[in-house]
């Protein structure tokens, strides 16, 4: 009897494919290369969820509090708070409200003195990537697509290193209330 192979058995680490290694080395966003500095080297997650946040304000916390448990274990939630130089004032203010609310929760967070900070979340860990300051804002006309790419590149780098079990990179919006079976 032949058994189907589980997609989570795809090559990782040194066995990862040449194309994947090339992508991470040449095309991934800079946060992907620095992620292991912010997370414990031996930390493992069952699932990863990427959420771009643009002008969400404190409402982002409601979405984060609705993240359900994952059947494969703890979840790494990557939130990319982002704006561009031309973002309206209300977006900038809402982003600063989001960051202030998250930093209120991030007391004792593991950071690098950089725009990435990690804290415990009831379902695993929360990684906040701040792309709202001079030199870090997103280029014009890249918006949510680039913010999702930043989160996905970080997730891919962790998956390749064996830090995430599920082969799925989940992406959602910052104003969503998640159903209990989201990761099923």
What are these model-derived regions, one by one?
Residues 50-54, 137-145, 172-177:
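Short, charged/polar micro-motifs that form catalytic or ligand-binding hotspots
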Residues 60-62, 88-92, 139, 179-183:
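A short acidic (Asp/Glu
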Residues 58, 163-167, 171-184:
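Acidic donor-binding/catalytic loop of UDP-sugar-dependent glycosyltransferases
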Residues 24-32, 88-166:
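Active-site-proximal specificity loops/subdomain of glycosyltransferases
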Residues 2-76, 83:
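N-proximal low-complexity "stem/linker" segments adjacent to membrane-targeting elements
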Residues 66-70, 95, 184:
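Amphipathic alpha-helical scaffolding segments
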Residues 34, 60-65, 111-114, 181-184:
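Short alpha-helical segments and helix-capping/turn motifs at coil-helix boundaries
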Residues 49-50, 78-81, 125-132, 167-177:
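Extended hydrophobic secondary-structure segments that form protein cores and membrane-embedded regions
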